């Protein structure tokens, strides 16, 4: 018996040691469909030690320099801090996949959609819409009809046109056709059709020339046909006309059956005529298409090198969570939801702080404020809210349309949860699927803190929550469903400014972040220092 015990003791000790090491080891930093994070969800007792705060830093794959600056400034200070180092877990949030399409070949720099132009129609005029030969041209009941489109490669519109009634002899109508740039109230140009001035007949349309402008890539416009008579227009559903996109240089934007119309739509969605256009800079387009295969190969090689660098970086620092998304701006909300899932499934924590890799963060100040203000309750959202109660838009340096605050709104704390922020229908912050003209209140993305129960709710509903154009506005829309207690705090700065006692400040270069932290360490104030020759 003793012999058996002697043999068993090493096995028991080995198993105990293995279990102890397993419990102490950090969870794998990977948030993907059926990866280790999902396996850990089955064994919550194997989570790593408890943290007061988990910090998630949104970071792009190629932002190595910004991450290294953070590691050498506030993160280094945190790791060396005698008490905070054991209370905080910091992870960079990075998409596991790079976009396989080079930036030059994407529809826009914010997504990963291929600019799919093939066999472009060059050096000739193109009719945007045409009717099949066997289509009758009866009058509808609609007196105002509009269609929206997006330009994917520069074009010039030369003429606007209207369908005509085959039963009429000549042109017997009074119709106005206008082209608007999206979100603009004044038409770029107008064509007026009447019996004495009906233009030129081409196929089943009457056309009139207009002043010629180059419509650049990413231009979004709406053509509106309006009958000046009591009769409706000769119009067709978009599915009953042929769209001639010139090989892919433009795309018609439709709301889709059963969906709400876009805000800039007028009247009924459809086509009551057309326009003639030519493709601009055709030779440059052909050259670009010719060089695309070589560019795709080079880009694929660059992605492999980037993957290798990221694997090495993660191995060295062990502070990256790779989430299972393609790393583009449009996918940032999905990155955040995946990180919430990873956090819930692999860690034990009280609060979660979200920030970006171009932000100055003062974690000591964050902890001091948590203790001083008792900011640790349930269903809790601590950030910066800009309160606005009217709809007068203003343009910020960032180019985003905001809403001017009224005097009454400024009676709150130094604010910056953004409220009544206008929804952009074009550009980087374009949002076509949120029907309201303004977003619910949302916090500045430079930094905010949410309670554990909110993180659990977001993680549990990650598969159902719709993502919108930005992670900040998406967060506001998601939070509108649960109505958290908001603590408004202007020390989470929304713009690139420096204030004493600030908790965060965004949009800095690596060199600027280094300077801020050097001032902070030397004088206790990142904004100014008597011994330094200037500050921010």
Q: Whereabouts are the PLM-identified features?
A:
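Active-site-proximal specificity loops/subdomain of glycosyltransferases
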Residues: 86, 91-122, 289-350, 424
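PGST-rich, cysteine-poor low-complexity/disordered linker and tail segments that act as flexible spacers
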Residues: 145-147, 239-302
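Conserved catalytic core of nucleotide-sugar-dependent glycosyltransferases
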Residues: 100, 117-138, 312, 329-333, ...
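Aromatic- and Gly/Pro-enriched, solvent-exposed loop/edge beta-strand patches characteristic
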Residues: 98, 108-123, 169-256
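A short beta-strand element within beta-rich, extracytoplasmic domains
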Residues: 155-168, 222-225
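N-terminal signal-anchor transmembrane helix specifying type II single-pass membrane topology
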Residues: 1-39, 61-64, 70
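Extracellular and analogous surface-interaction loops
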Residues: 146-156, 167, 210-217, 451
């Amino acid at each position: 018996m003793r012999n058996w015990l002697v043999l068993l003791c090493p096995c028991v000790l080995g198993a105990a040691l293995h279990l102890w090491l397993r419990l102490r080891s950090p969870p794998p930093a990977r948030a993907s469909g059926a990866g280790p994070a999902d396996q850990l969800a089955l064994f919550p007792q194997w989570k790593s030690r408890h943290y007061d705060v988990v910090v998630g830093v949104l970071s792009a794959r190629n932002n190595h320099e910004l991450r290294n600056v953070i590691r050498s400034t506030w993160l280094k200070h945190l790791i060396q801090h005698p008490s905070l180092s054991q209370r905080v877990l910091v992870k960079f949030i990075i998409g596991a996949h790079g976009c396989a399409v080079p930036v030059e070949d994407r529809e826009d720099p914010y997504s990963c959609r291929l600019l799919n132009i093939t066999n472009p129609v060059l050096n000739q005029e193109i009719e945007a819409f045409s009717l099949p030969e066997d289509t009758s041209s009866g009058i509808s009941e609609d007196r105002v009809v509009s269609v929206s489109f997006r330009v994917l490669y520069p074009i010039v519109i030369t003429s606007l046109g209207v369908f005509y009634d085959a039963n009429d002899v000549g042109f017997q109508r009074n119709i106005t056709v206008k082209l608007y740039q999206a979100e603009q109230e004044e038409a770029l140009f107008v064509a007026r059709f009447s019996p004495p001035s009906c233009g030129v007949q081409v196929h089943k349309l009457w056309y009139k020339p207009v002043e010629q402008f180059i419509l650049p890539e990413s231009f979004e416009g709406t053509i509106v046909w309006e009958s000046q008579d009591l009769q409706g227009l000769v119009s067709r559903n978009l599915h009953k006309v042929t769209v001639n996109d010139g090989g892919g240089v433009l795309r018609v934007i439709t709301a889709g059956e059963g969906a709400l119309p876009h805000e800039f739509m007028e009247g009924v969605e459809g086509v009551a005529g057309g326009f003639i256009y030519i493709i601009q800079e055709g030779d440059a387009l052909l050259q670009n298409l010719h060089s695309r295969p070589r560019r795709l190969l080079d880009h694929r090689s660059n992605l492999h090198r980037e993957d290798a660098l990221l694997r090495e970086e993660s191995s060295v620092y062990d502070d990256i969570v790779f989430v299972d998304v393609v790393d583009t701006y449009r996918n940032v909300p999905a990155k955040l939801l995946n990180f919430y899932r990873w956090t819930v499934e692999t860690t034990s924590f009280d609060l979660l702080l979200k920030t970006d890799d171009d932000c100055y963060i003062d974690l000591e100040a964050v902890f001091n404020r948590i203790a001083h203000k008792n900011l640790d309750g349930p269903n809790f959202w601590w950030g910066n809210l800009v309160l606005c109660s009217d709809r007068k838009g203003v343009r910020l340096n960032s180019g985003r349309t905001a809403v001017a605050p009224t005097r009454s709104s400024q009676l709150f704390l130094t604010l910056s949860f953004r409220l009544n922020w206008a929804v952009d229908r074009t550009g980087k912050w374009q949002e076509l699927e949120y029907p309201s003209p303004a977003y619910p209140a949302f916090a500045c993305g430079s930094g905010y803190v949410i309670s554990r129960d909110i993180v659990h709710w977001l993680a549990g509903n990650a598969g159902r929550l719709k993502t919108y154009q930005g992670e900040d506005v998406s967060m506001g829309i998601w939070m509108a469903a649960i109505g958290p207690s908001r603590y408004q705090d202007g020390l989470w700065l929304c713009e690139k400014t420096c204030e004493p006692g600030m908790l965060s400040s965004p949009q800095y270069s690596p060199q600027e972040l280094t300077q801020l932290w050097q001032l902070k360490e030397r004088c206790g104030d990142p904004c100014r220092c008597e011994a330094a020759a200037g500050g921010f």
